[in-house]
UniProtKB/Swiss-Prot annotation:
Involved in peptide bond synthesis. Stimulates efficient translation and peptide-bond synthesis on native or reconstituted 70S ribosomes in vitro. Probably functions indirectly by altering the affinity of the ribosome for aminoacyl-tRNA, thus increasing their reactivity as acceptors for peptidyl transferase. It comes from Shewanella sediminis (strain HAW-EB3). It comes from the Bacteria. Pfam families: EFP, EFP_N, Elong-fact-P_C. Belongs to the elongation factor P family. The keyword Ribonucleoprotein does not apply. Keywords: Cytoplasm, Elongation factor, Protein biosynthesis. One of its GO terms (cellular component) is cytoplasm. This is Elongation factor P. Disulfide bonds: none annotated. It is found in: Cytoplasm.
């Protein structure tokens, strides 16, 4: 059993007797009240999605499923195709990827973990750090250097995130795809 705080995108939880893939989590903390965790979930069996709110201490059954290390191969609308070390291919529906789809690019070399439920590939977990090229960002503004200055940037794959003010278009950066946060220049 895990608490709602410990659940991450890509985990599969049992809720009301059905397995659900966690696509997105967002934790909100307020001064007096306990933390609240909002989750976007996709039902593995019915292909339906829902957004649910939990208290941070709520216990959930995290289902242990078969996981394989795979690399991204290609996109065949609406399926992303991943390949394991023995050259077996696994199709994952784009709807099962959630926010991770924005970080998947042609030619990516990072090893991903594909999760299976009853023989069907249901989700993909990206590594904790990936390197991507910044395809567009505004030039840095002079004089705005007090504190940690961030600006929006678009990376290869289409995701938009906040990066440090000194990052320029064309540079490679390290990103945590689970949170969408900029880590450092690569």
């Amino acid at each position: 059993m895990k608490t709602a705080h410990e659940i991450r995108p890509g985990n599969v939880i049992m809720l009301n007797g059905s397995p659900w893939v966690v696509q997105k989590t967002e934790t909100t903390r307020s001064g007096r009240n306990a933390a609240i965790v909002k989750m976007k979930l996709k039902n593995v069996l019915l292909d339906s999605t829902t957004e649910t709110t939990f208290k941070g201490e709520d216990k959930m059954e995290d289902i242990i499923l078969e996981r394989l290390d795979c690399t991204y191969s290609y996109f065949a609308d609406p399926m992303y195709v991943f390949m394991d070390a023995e050259y077996n291919q696994y199709d994952v529906e784009s709807g099962n990827l959630g926010d991770a789809a924005a970080y998947i690019t042609d030619g990516m070399e990072e090893i991903c973990q594909v999760t299976f439920y009853e023989g069907k590939a249901i989700s993909v977990e990206l590594p904790t750090t990936i390197v991507r090229e910044v395809t567009y960002t505004e030039p840095s503004a002079r004089g705005d250097t007090s504190g940690k200055v961030m600006k929006p940037a678009t990376i290869a794959g289409g995701a938009t995130l906040s990066v440090a003010d000194f990052i320029k278009t064309g540079e490679m950066i390290e990103i945590d795809p689970r949170t969408g946060e900029f880590k450092k220049r690569a």
